[in-house]
Amino acid sequence: MKNGFGKTLSLGIQHVLAMYAGAIVVPLIVGKAMGLTVEQLTYLVSIDIFMCGVATLLQVLSNRFFGIGLPVVLGCTFTAVSPIIAIGAEYGVSAVYGSIIASGILVILISFFFGKLASFFPPVVTGSVVTIIGITLMPVAMNNMAGGEGSADFGELSNLVLAFVVLSIIVLLYRFSKGFIKSISILIGILIGTFIAYFMGKVQFDNVSDAAAVQMIQPFYFGMPSFHAAPIITMSIVAIVSLVESTGVYFALGDLTNRRLTEKDLSKGYRAEGLAVLLGGIFNAFPYTAFSQNVGLVQLTGIKKNAVIVVTGIILMAFGLFPKIAAFTTIIPSAVLGGAMVAMFGMVIAYGIKMLSRIDFAKQENLLIVACSVGLGLGVTVVPDIFKQLPSALTLLTTNGIVAGSITAVILNIVYNVFSRAEKTERNADAIEQKTAV
């Protein structure tokens, strides 16, 4: 049965709502951490929403060069939050976008053969990395629950009550609602929390009234990018981790749509993601990855048509052209965001643990990979000054929990699993050769 335009439009809006909270939280966290003005923050949210639409269309409108052609929605990756904040603090905003541009180019280059590197990123690595991502983001959530780091009312009871009300709403909706309402429970929690905060005197609409009605998208809004080795390496690691995450989403959607993905399909998907990251750097947005929450919505609705996602991409681009829509997101109090972040980042941790559950922990090597990578990732997050005496080129790699933990997981996997398999294969070949000789 064919979908009418009205139904396709409504389904497209559902996908926008399902990913909207995750899409706006990243620019809000990053923008506030880097001390952007209200005008700059409004632009950052606007361009991010716009580029989410562009990135989505690059993937769904498949051609011979790029695009996986599945009903996939792309959004800014949470993996990049901590590294972007660290790069911005150490090198400035120009280096942030220089590193994003460089990582986008890297993804495009490795897209031709990344599928062959899967042995370097098994579940023991990806599960550890995703778990570390959630853990290292949790301090951001806790600071926001208290009112925002450095705020005059940090830790006040009103902020904590507001944050826990939002968290409670999300938990209750997850428990008692079904279908689409359940899929947008975080967005509903943020909206209700902001409504309550208004009556507590914590919401001001000046930013909305001051915002322009329409805004043209422009490249290099924050100035020309600069390129430094350490930020580029850091963001390249983030991009590769995002590719691994996206691969899981691609295969999940392939199963849902009864489509067997080939290596060529994956390469085109990676290439589209690389283009999205490159454009994100040029237009001062973010790195992009496939959003898993929209996979759940495809499963819930049973509608697997690419036309729905095309509509989603167009809606996102349209939203990005109207700053007043973005300005509404800047009025959300930090405590409200903090309550929602606990749920979102906690879900990231839970998803990482779920990925780790598929591992054979009877092998001591896997236990050690998880132990060392998660341990170092958490340790560096709690004590960021531990590697302060190292050269400045290395500190960005060692003082970020996500990067430190990811590098540890990849190296240990190579040592314990990749090399050991190669040695085992070589021994078997020698044994066969000896038997043949006899």
Regions picked out by a protein language model, each given a short descriptive name:
Residues 39, 47, 57-116:
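Membrane helical hairpin/interfacial module
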